[in-house]
Amino acid sequence: MAFKRKFTPKRKFCRFCADKNLPLDYKRPDILKDFVTERGKIIARRITGTCAKHQRRLTTEIKRSRQMALMHYTTVHSTDVKKKSI
């Protein structure tokens, strides 16, 4: 007897391939934060659904945005620092 799936998983797709007008740029942290966990780790492409080409570029742009101080390295740490200084 073969195992039959109860449901078919939803097909993941690359947001950047689907929408050519969506800019992948370090100056847009509002888009980049969707691909970073609350701990500051970059989410794997098997979870986000991005293609290999855009995942590489996404990683580069997130790191560049962090260097330019447009994004935090970790969001949890940044809120703890604010609480201690008050």
From Swiss-Prot:
NCBIfam families assigned to the protein according to its UniProt record, in alphabetical order: S18
Cystine bridges: none
Pfam family, one: Ribosomal_S18
Subunit structure: Part of the 30S ribosomal subunit. Forms a tight heterodimer with protein bS6.
Its biological purpose: Binds as a heterodimer with protein bS6 to the central domain of the 16S rRNA, where it helps stabilize the platform of the 30S subunit.
Gene3D superfamilies per the UniProt record, alphabetical: Ribosomal protein S18
Protein name as annotated: Small ribosomal subunit protein bS18
GO cellular component term, pick one: cytosolic small ribosomal subunit
Keywords: Ribonucleoprotein, Ribosomal protein, RNA-binding, rRNA-binding
HAMAP family, A to Z: Ribosomal_bS18
Protein's UniProt keywords contain Ribosomal protein: yes
